[in-house]
Amino acid sequence: MTGMDFRGRVFLAPLTKGGNLPFRRLCVAHGCRVTMGEMAYAYQVVRGSRSELALLRKHADEACFGVQIAASRPADAVRAGVAAAERGAGWVDLNCGCPIHDVVRRGMGATLLQKPQRLGRLVAEMVQGIPVPVTVKIRLGWSEREDNASEVARVVEEAGAAALSVHGRTREQRYSRAADWVAIARIAAERSIPVIGNGDVLTWFEAHDRWQASGVASLMIGRGALIKPWIFREIEERKAWEPT
């Protein structure tokens, strides 16, 4: 296990199709100190897919870098996590929030929210088999009728995860509604492991307001960084900034 501290950080979210290495370097140049690679399919990493293995690659500029994987089978998750650690990942994150049909039909991503006990076993085996911290990223549930994020968060913590990222929408909502920071705050209060809040952080003042009001340990920024990669600098300096 590394000494990775998941508190007091602003993370660049794992952005599928957007968070490639050049983009991450751009964010680093504008103040981002914690980066994550694009989601990688664990089973493809295990098969040796070049394109998937490329998602585990970090640049020397990325001093604090994590890899996110999508997995349904513990053996694949562990092997992919070990491969990520061997390539310099400081931690490995399990995606339990991706709403895309191709992901959920394979039993990965948001599907795992519907099977908390299976998710717990998966996380426990990852924690046991991967030599760096294991984290989990979830949504609030499969739908508003299946809002079980508190249960999922408890299971994840009991399985040994080092931290939990919570995106404030359900799988069904995708991005159709505003992120529910009241729900994120509730989960942060219920858990002892660091909870990282994610969703609708588009400005430096939203970042500070939501961080303080919710009591989360850290923030994770996705679309806000795609809109302006220098948002990390703005958050640190507490003022708007425009590149010239």
Residue ranges and their predicted role:
Residues 1-244:
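Flavin-dependent oxidoreductase catalytic cores
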